[in-house]
């Protein structure tokens, strides 16, 4: 627990009590938060009103409002800070309208890791990743290519970020080591389904699938830092991943050839299929489907874990809206 960290559950409870009472009172407080993102918005009268979000202790995320005539706004607009890296002390007011930040200033003595959710053991996930590669039937040449692309031997910044970064901002595996865990699960899914379906895979195309799955989300190490979008995130992790691949194309072409490089390039570009550049190869489509399968199953599993259901409860207290793959508790109606 972060000393002097903001207790968002208590803050939310206070806001709810103020709303329920119909009171106009405000409650002041302060706390420590890891700066995440902020974006400018406006009130009904067109006055600037940025929206700010940050991580509090235990990985919870919280959103605030910041008025343009307050010191907190000046800090966000003028001072140097790094999203996902800068820890700040905030002074705020709670009212029936929510939480408003009055003042914000950087504070020393805190580590961003103190605010980030840990669900995975990085060593365990690293071992699982290596095991999944061995089980894939990929050639030693493919394993060597992956090792070079992910800089396993050098253990440099690229490798560290791949092993530590989040897989998503707010969906599945949005936690420390989530990217590595998601990638490993995708490899495991592939290992399972390729025994049931032919897909006309041979040694070369199996290598193609394994390498593609291993690096399909590599762009996320540039898109995010500590689960927070960075300056060029608007390019998307697919665009940043393609850029990374071009920088390392010699690794692939020296082991395979130019066509092989572009086949992997197409997977990174198209693995979101209808949500991006549509899949134009079988391999891009397969990676897209495997990626979606893990995202869906991981979201279900995380919801069950968060609710702390027993085995029997998990089987009976969850309902699904298949059209949107949304998860609902049994005691809630879809309308809610």
Q: PLM features: residue spans?
A:
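OB-fold (S1/OB) nucleic-acid-binding surfaces
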Residues: 43-70
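Structural detector for short beta-strands of small beta-barrel domains
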Residues: 25-46
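Divalent metal-dependent catalytic cores for phosphoryl transfer on phosphate-bearing substrates
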Residues: 198-199, 204-307
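Acidic/His-rich, divalent-metal-binding segments that scaffold phosphate/diphosphate chemistry
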Residues: 112-230
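Short nucleic-acid-contacting surface segments enriched for D/E, G, S/T with interspersed K/R
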Residues: 26-29, 68-91
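OB-fold/S1-family single-stranded nucleic acid-binding modules
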Residues: 91-122
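OB-fold nucleic-acid-binding modules
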Residues: 1-32
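Divalent metal-coordination and catalytic microenvironments
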Residues: 33, 186, 291
């Amino acid at each position: 627990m972060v000393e002097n960290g903001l207790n968002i559950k208590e803050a939310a409870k206070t806001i709810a009590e103020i709303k329920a009472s119909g009171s106009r009172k405000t409650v002041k407080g302060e706390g420590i938060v890891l700066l995440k993102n902020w974006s400018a918005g406006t009130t009904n009268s067109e006055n600037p009103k940025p929206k700010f979000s940050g991580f509090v202790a235990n990985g919870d995320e919280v959103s605030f409002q910041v008025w343009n005539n307050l010191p907190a706004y000046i800090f966000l607009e003028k001072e140097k800070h790094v999203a996902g890296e800068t820890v700040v002390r905030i002074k705020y007011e709670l009212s029936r309208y929510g939480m408003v930040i009055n003042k914000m200033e950087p504070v020393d003595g805190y580590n961003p890791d103190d605010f980030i959710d840990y669900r995975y053991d990085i060593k365990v996930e690293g071992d699982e990743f290596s095991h999944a590669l061995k089980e894939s039937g990929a050639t030693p040449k493919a394993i060597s290519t992956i090792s070079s692309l992910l800089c396993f031997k050098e253990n440099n910044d690229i490798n560290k970020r791949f092993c530590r970064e989040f897989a998503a901002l707010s969906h599945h595996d949005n936690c420390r080591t989530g990217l590595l865990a998601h990638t490993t699960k995708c490899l495991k899914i592939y290992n399972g389904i390729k025994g049931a379906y032919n897909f006309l895979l041979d040694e070369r195309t199996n290598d193609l699938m394994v390498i593609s799955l291993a690096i399909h989300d590599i762009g996320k190490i540039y898109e995010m830092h500590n689960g927070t979008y960075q300056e060029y995130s608007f390019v998307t992790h697919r665009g940043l991943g393609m850029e990374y691949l071009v920088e390392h194309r010699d690794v692939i072409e020296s082991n395979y050839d130019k066509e092989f490089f572009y086949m992997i390039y197409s997977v990174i570009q198209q693995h979101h299929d209808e949500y991006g550049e549509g899949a134009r190869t079988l391999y891009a489509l397969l990676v897209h489907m495997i990626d979606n399968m893990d995202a869906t199953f991981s979201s279900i599993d995380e919801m069950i874990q968060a609710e702390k259901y027993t085995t029997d409860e998990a089987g009976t207290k969850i309902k699904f809206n298949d059209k949107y793959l949304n998860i609902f508790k049994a005691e809630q109606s879809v309308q809610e």
